[in-house]
Amino acid sequence: MAALGTWLSSVRRLHCSVVARAGGQWRLQQGLAANPSGYGPLTELPDWSFADGRPAPPMKGQLRRKAQREKLARRVVLLTQEMDAGIQAWKLRQQKLQEERKKEHDLKPKGTLLRSPLPNQ
């Protein structure tokens, strides 16, 4: 009985060890998913098609993944639009500040103020 417990614990350690996840790093380096069932032709393409060549109707998992990708794409577009608007507003603000600084540093007329008569108080 004790030998069975030792054997089971060694099997559990082997199953949870680095050996079980060894291919994940290689798959990431090759541009694939860390998990082989994450994405790719095996999960994205239909499992079968009709004999006359029509594609099979999409499965629930395919529809769910498609909806997730569309949602992510919408969010990316929204965030890039917000970034573009923010950059444009920042550029306008910087341009206005630069114009104000330029006006501050312009030469000011001094002689005309001295020649004009003082207003009666």
Curated annotation (Swiss-Prot):
Identification of the protein by name: Large ribosomal subunit protein mL52
Pfam families given in the database record: MRPL52
Family: Belongs to the mitochondrion-specific ribosomal protein mL52 family.
Entry keywords, A to Z: Mitochondrion, Ribonucleoprotein, Ribosomal protein, Transit peptide
Presequence boundaries: 1-22
Assembly, per entry: Component of the mitochondrial ribosome large subunit (39S) which comprises a 16S rRNA and about 50 distinct proteins.
Protein's cellular compartments: Mitochondrion
GO molecular function: structural constituent of ribosome
Biological processes per GO annotation: mitochondrial translation; translation
Alphabetized InterPro entries for the sequence: Ribosomal_mL52
Region named Disordered: 98-121
Biased composition (Basic and acidic residues): 98-109
Organism: Mus musculus (Mouse)
One GO term describing the cellular component: mitochondrion
